[in-house]
């Protein structure tokens, strides 16, 4: 008899987005001609930047010539891409990050789950509530939790509520924790963290010898010059933080797949006996064993993001989506909703009307407006009573969707 990983059986009924898909498909079976507009899953809609496409076409041609053909690449990523990332995304902002500390991957979603491979099972883990579900589910799969209660909260995790009262930025834990997930700009709430707030987290982590997992997948959407783009802009962060980044949303790579993780050399964890161990070495070992690297063609496309043309085209994409976010905020406010986010992030977080439950409001929006959002309750118990809308869609669809909402609710 082959035994399964019983931790998977602790997972709640279904990952959030498959459950949304199930409800939408059920609706479409009953209403096949409904003009549905999807503002739920944060998938991009606009084409890859021309600079990236041109670089990838050139790379494909190189793969057709024996003299320039590439086989297996370095597991950590090609040096020319890592050097561009280090220079443009970190050193240009005063961050002391070297190319050797950057690991290219096929997605930050993968990395935020895979990073657990190098950490032990006895760590006390803190997540915000609401939270990107992957952080919680991967810890459940790894056996780091007990069972979930009726609110969907897993025993063994420390939940840090983020609410309108604390501006959707969690207060520091009242107890020592070892691993802390932070996401800014935040998914799902669209909130950002000030320099002072991030400094408090770094100080806490250093005091308790904890590690911050800092997900900066949406940093390109920050419009406020006072808001840090990287945790490494904060003094002391090299001693306590791992940062995750992605090309998915800023450059439209959701279907192309390229991201990176930063693990500073000198960042340490410890063994049960108390010996210090460098995390960079463990992650490098993990990646070289379990990962063969991102394709040469895709990495050339990612490199083009940092060209002069690529930078201009990425800014154009980001500006396009942020204008969508502005329109969503404006129209929802006009319709009488309490609205958050959408200023430094491509997500708008709205309070459901009249105390309606998140899934009830999801269904009402679907059936009344033919608009798909993401129920806040799917991100955690503290997300109940909210719904997330994504700015990732065409301008035409965003305008039409908001007109429907205003007509239905204003």
Curated annotation (Swiss-Prot):
* Binding-site residues, pyridoxal 5'-phosphate: 72, 108-109, 132, 187, 218, 246-248, 257, 292
Question: According to its UniProt record, in which pathway does this protein act?
Answer: Amino-acid biosynthesis; L-lysine biosynthesis via DAP pathway; LL-2,6-diaminopimelate from (S)-tetrahydrodipicolinate (aminotransferase route): step 1/1
| Entry keywords, A to Z | Aminotransferase, Pyridoxal phosphate, Transferase
Q: Which residues bind substrate?
A: 15, 42, 109, 132, 187, 292, 388
Q: How is the subunit organization of this protein annotated in UniProt?
A: Homodimer.
HAMAP family (alphabetical): DapL_aminotrans_1
What is the protein's name according to its record?
A: LL-diaminopimelate aminotransferase
